[in-house]
């Protein structure tokens, strides 16, 4: 810490200012403000970050000492002001906690009550927020014995004012000889770290990571130091080198990583104006600019900054894991000498952990760099890798070069890992953490820490990829068969499961380079397969899966699956039942690995429907597709059979059907048609809107709630309906709109409740929805079509210009309106209002919300039930949608019209 820094704080000048005024408060406030401005300016100039946070601690020392000395403590008073915790280490960020201990020899606090209260009141008045405790030596010992946080705080302390001997005595009464011996302290800190990591989903790769508490964050480094200090009296990171816990190169990496996180944390506090340790979306871009990152052709500045962040914390996590393992071996020694199990000439198991038989193993046999992970997969009961062996792995990564990658023995070992029945994900994750995976597959190395700046992809590309492989492995678990029945059944039947793991490894590997990542990944996958000498048929399947890994999800979510042509087109691209099985399983794992909240019962139902319809098409033969007329005939016959069995007059049903048109029978199942028909025939003509509600399937983890509305058509029908559903907290995922020749509308909406699930068997909720819709449709003029609700913070940050595409369908007499826009509360209601203003009729809609963006497709006609044909009308429609959905700060993006 500096002895004096007059630019930051000049004690003489400060004392002179105090003498000029009756109240000390203005002078203290001015000093605090000026110090913050000086330090912030130095930060923006790029000054050394360690010096900055130490300078701030020094400055606060001066302020506190001067404030303390304003009060009468008497010369021989046994009371001291002690800095503890991070402040005790001499580290302070702009809004870090200033933790103080007012320490007394005796237990009688009353003696010093008046000056203590005056001192703390002064700190409050000048705006210096501190965390304080007032304790005697005996109370310190008692509190420290009972509370891990207290003993940890007291281990790092400095005397700010008062006699130093009090702090030294406190150190004695709370020493490891008196309480919290190193073994107990280590076990408690290890459990504390596990609990903390679990709060952040055990990943370094959260979208808005906490630079202090997340895995690989500053707290992990501090935890190492606390344990080392308790056991060995270590005072700083570099001392761990001399004690044999870190190599000099590891210390250098850890110290530079710590300084990077300090810069990020300082910037966070400075920009947020508060103690903010979360890398919030709305600050990530600003920090990227502040730290000098710029956009490139392939990556945004914020993506480059966050990739650096993720790689730094991954490196910290790797090193802290190594040192933790080292601590465990030293502090918790097992019966190492008597529990050695040789595996081969290169490896043995000691006390449950894998290790090399001698330090030269990797140098003599480089293939052992891969063999170690194959052994771990074969022996899942092995608890991990010993610290010295982890270090040797890290030190010998350089041996993995092009010759190593081409060696048939090494390629065979890598493929063997994917054929393991257990431990594939766990050992790939280990390989990634130890830097082996990115070294063996340089293309994978490029995606390590690669984020995508959106809410759709909540993991970095490498974390997402490994999560996908974990999801594939979990599909073998019997307990997941209920949630993923079809995927669990299919993965058991796949002839070569290792091929889907390899496709999963490569499916997103082309991201971050610009261009089509599916095509880039397919090229990389082909090169991988050829280098690993995979059979031509296996290579063809892997490359096809990588190239088409988005095909099934985009078809299910964006196309009308009731259209036979959609199924035929998809089946033509798949062409083979085995390919369909692999693609379905990969798609399920991919969606769940992208963002678990994206997987809902409706998406599950859509994918099953697409799989089943395609399976039938492939069995029937692609040269014999079912025509529209044949499908309508079959659907009507099946529906009529159901109705006759329930006692409905077939003549009444067929008379009603003549008013509905072909699309109705293409877009509904026979059971739904029977359900609609029976209810309509029984509904009195003067009974107002008919609203039917039921589940789309009885499968527990699939489907959604289906709302069918039959009512006289009215101009604002869609706008009022979606606004009412918005007010009822329903999210619409699909809409099918039919208008009969008798001018009745038959609308079906597929909805999920606010929690992402279907309504289920909830009579009260069903009645609330039915009443709300009937009331809105009976009194449309009184119903607000636009509901103003607060936009969530994260959505606000991801504003972008809406994209509106208008084109006529080549196969059907409708216009396709595609909208990509930021998600906002009430968005569909706004679109419905625009349709109303432009006199458009909605025929069908596919609604998809992907993180912070919606990608909706609407099939519309004009007032005469014809496709849109007026370019000027389309241009005005396009502009109206873009203006209505645009964020206030975003521009209107030019979009395409093709009519």
Swiss-Prot record:
Reaction(s) catalysed by this chain's protein: [protein-PII]-L-tyrosine + UTP = [protein-PII]-uridylyl-L-tyrosine + diphosphate; [protein-PII]-uridylyl-L-tyrosine + H2O = [protein-PII]-L-tyrosine + UMP + H(+)
HD domain span: 461-583
Role noted for this protein: Modifies, by uridylylation and deuridylylation, the PII regulatory protein GlnK, in response to the nitrogen status of the cell that GlnD senses through the glutamine level. Under low glutamine levels, catalyzes the conversion of the PII protein and UTP to PII-UMP and PPi, while under higher glutamine levels, GlnD hydrolyzes PII-UMP to PII and UMP (deuridylylation). Thus, controls uridylylation state and activity of the PII protein, and plays an important role in the regulation of nitrogen fixation and metabolism.
InterPro entries the record matches: ACT-like_dom_sf (IPR045865), ACT_dom (IPR002912), HD/PDEase_dom (IPR003607), HD_domain (IPR006674), NT_sf (IPR043519), PII_UdlTrfase/GS_AdlTrfase (IPR013546), Polymerase_NTP_transf_dom (IPR002934), UTase/UR (IPR010043)
Activity modulation notes: Uridylyltransferase (UTase) activity is inhibited by glutamine, while glutamine activates uridylyl-removing (UR) activity.
Taxonomic path: Bacteria, Pseudomonadati, Pseudomonadota, Gammaproteobacteria, Pseudomonadales
The name this protein goes by in its record: Bifunctional uridylyltransferase/uridylyl-removing enzyme
EC number: 2.7.7.59, 3.1.4.-
